Amino acid sequence: MHPKQQRESFRSKQYTGTTSGMCDNYLQANMIILPKEYAFEFLLFCQRNPKSCPIIDVLEEGVTTPQIADADIRTDLPKYRIYRNGQLDKEVTDIKDKWRADFVTFLIGCSFTFEKALIENGIRLLHQEQERVVPMYKTNIPCEKAGRFEGNMVVSMRALEPEEIDKAVKITERFETSHGSPVHIGNPEEIGIKDIDNPDYGESISFDKKKRTPVFWACGVTPQNVGLNVKPPIMIAHAPGHMLITDQLEEK
Amino acid sequence: MHPKQQRESFRSKQYTGTTSGMCDNYLQANMIILPKEYAFEFLLFCQRNPKSCPIIDVLEEGVTTPQIADADIRTDLPKYRIYRNGQLDKEVTDIKDKWRADFVTFLIGCSFTFEKALIENGIRLLHQEQERVVPMYKTNIPCEKAGRFEGNMVVSMRALEPEEIDKAVKITERFETSHGSPVHIGNPEEIGIKDIDNPDYGESISFDKKKRTPVFWACGVTPQNVGLNVKPPIMIAHAPGHMLITDQLEEK
């Protein structure tokens, strides 16, 4: 389905599930909406932490149509999360009645893009084969602070065979708007992950620890996580896995 | 002289002239200070126009020491310009008594860095040989707008021999924090420059139009120019050519 049609199916609430695997070749994006009062510090945070927060578009205050998608961001994602004072308030399927003229919207690259490139290059991704959401972990790797925004990096993990790792590094480092090369390879404890089978977000995957090595990439959940630390009166984000599908073709 | 000592000579007002040619190998930066109310839109403008406005550091509100220089930006530049409502108010040698807790400071790459690389690669720069400030021109090339910040690009011009141009492109495209590759080669009129001998900023240089081709690079005067269009109640910048000398070595 073309992105425009797909987004219309969300707008009409025909479909409200995950966007994983939809609209092949089109860039999907994490979305975070904050009141303008927070916008400068958050944009600076993203600029200082490009691996976790690769900015692909910013909608100035009150703007509801991105440059990279002929969409209305208030209705064209399948599911949204509304956070108040750093706590999840509720999940909704549109945010029309929540919209404010001082809202600034940030669109941030996601790993769907580089996963496709890995598979096309013959690298098997176990979470896809096991039909699970990729496992994500809080780490002890500090992000670079910007104003009130500070916290540690969240990473996603893919368990690879040793001979695939070099290739995976080379492939993903090209995707600057999709988290780039891995931030750690091999030892979960070194980056503060105590139990690889107990991810903080997403789902656990089964893999043979003797045959595969865990490889960690910066994850787009980082800015959401750091945003919540600041406890803004309101922050709106896509529900995990329920991304904005853009009209922009993925970089090759 | 080491950057720290050099900056102390500005702080003590022993020297208040241009920083051109000072502290070889250390990065110099354009500086723009705006009230926080403008900071988000200006940062977004820079991010959308990286060739004109390559951000090398941002100092959050009230902060006076950059990450890339052990300096006090209120005293450690040789000369400052204070603009009010889009008009030059005065030139001063420090801004201690003008400082406000809501000031946000932006440091932006400058072309001193790539000029050095050009010379090291055997390319003669006429404005240096003629001891003039590089000629700069307003163009008809629109910048990408961000909020209230909009306007056309300002470019600097270096007249090169035809066989030097390819090399100059290759050298400068590596300097992403120093304006990168040229934005136009050859025809000044095509980018809205009516008289190459009458620059809008800097000084005119003499060159044989039959033997040399004008090559244009995005220029760090662009953000100052665009900033003034917005007519902020106050905006402070370095005086042209009187840059912040940082402690950071230039990229190679």
Swiss-Prot record, chains A, B:
Pfam families: D-Glu_cyclase (PF07286). It comes from the Bacteria. Its EC number is 4.2.1.-. It is an enzyme of class 4 (lyase). The keyword Lyase applies. Belongs to the D-glutamate cyclase family. GO terms for molecular function: lyase activity. Keywords: Lyase. This is Putative hydro-lyase OB3382. The lineage of its organism: Bacteria, Bacillati, Bacillota, Bacilli, Bacillales. It comes from Oceanobacillus iheyensis (strain DSM 14371 / CIP 107618 / JCM 11309 / KCTC 3954 / HTE831). The keyword Lyase applies. HAMAP family: Hydro_lyase.
